[in-house]
């Protein structure tokens, strides 16, 4: 598609391809900025990022998409994405081609990534060397249970307690 002829494609989404990096697709609508937040991407890193929000999706009705050039994800980052956008798909791009495609899966155990909201939980005590420990209780909706105090974190509440 030639950008000068955009009027010929009124219903097309035009975002340039990336040479190397990732495309995070099938993010629930409105969650792309939260995905960038958990990845620690603010815009000042110098990474080229394309963000598309609330586009039509046969699977989800509406979805968000994030493209990040020259970025690849760690297991920790994949786990965090799975907790806030469990329908997401990660496409790894090398030399403009998709070389790997995977759906994210919430981890069954989440250790040290999320702070327990319960202020009396032992994992919140400053002089305790233990890290928070949550067990996946449900995937739809996502629910995590603290293994120390029993507090249950649900859905959108999770992103508020992600450790930075």
From Swiss-Prot:
Q: Which GO terms describe its cellular component?
A: aspartate carbamoyltransferase complex
What stretches pass through the bilayer?
none
A GO MF label: metal ion binding
Keywords attached to this entry: Metal-binding, Pyrimidine biosynthesis, Zinc
Per the record's keyword annotation, is Metal-binding included, yes or no? yes
Question: What does the note under cofactor report?
Answer: Binds 1 zinc ion per subunit.
List, separated by semicolons, the cofactors it needs: Zn(2+)
Q: Which residues make up the binding site for Zn(2+)? A: 116, 121, 146, 149
Task: Identify the Pfam families for this entry.
Answer: PyrI, PyrI_C
Q: Does the keyword Signal apply?
A: no
Give a GO biological-process term: pyrimidine nucleotide biosynthetic process
Residue ranges that the Swiss-Prot or TrEMBL entry lists as coiled coil = none
Q: Kindly state the subunit structure of this protein.
A: Contains catalytic and regulatory chains.
Family per record = Belongs to the PyrI family.
What is this protein's function per UniProt? Involved in allosteric regulation of aspartate carbamoyltransferase.
Annotated PANTHER family: ASPARTATE CARBAMOYLTRANSFERASE REGULATORY CHAIN
What name is this protein filed under?
Answer: Aspartate carbamoyltransferase regulatory chain
Its lineage opens with: Archaea, Thermoproteota, Thermoprotei, Desulfurococcales, Desulfurococcaceae
